[in-house]
Amino acid sequence: MITVENLSFTYRKSKRVVLHDFSLAFESGRVYGLLGKNGAGKSTLLYLMSGLLTPKGGKVMFHDTDVRRRLPVTLQDMFLVPEEFELPPVSLVSYIELNSSFYPRFSKEDMIKYLHYFEMDMDINLGSLSMGQKKKVFMSFALATNTSLLLMDEPTNGLDIPGKSQFRKFIASGMSDDKTIVISTHQVRDIDKVLDHVL
């Protein structure tokens, strides 16, 4: 599915080595948790896996293609939910119209279903939402793209206790045998019930 092969990464400014000769394989049909303190390299690994960062050495292979190539056929089958992001002040319907075409397997029906897990609906304007609400909408969109690889960086940050419970049900409902989900967290108890493996 996706393999990390002898990966090394160093931040240029600080010269801090984050990963050195790191290898790992992720299988389909599994939810993986990347557990570690802040600054341990969890986010860096997710960005390397998505091709948004370039390793000093080694490579990440997704469907037998190096993610550094950023090919459309690769990008349409992976989705990264960063810890911090901005959404435009437009209606959710407009946002979906603008962005769903990049993901051939996007399902509006799935989007509605996932929003319901968070007690939200389609008739909302993104500019009027709190950060926690924006996160719920963006995660719902991410899962509704039906990509085979979903990367999530600290997705429960900013969610209250009911929101974290909703998140666990949301992830469980979106899993399938051909999907791999990788979640970084420093609070494993928030998501331990949905994880197949903790790394």
Where do the protein language model's features map onto the residues?
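Conserved ABC transporter NBD signature motif
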Residues: 58-69, 73-74
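Helical segment within the ABC ATPase nucleotide-binding domain
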Residues: 164-177
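The feature captures the beta-strand-to-loop junction immediately N-terminal to the Walker
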Residues: 32-37
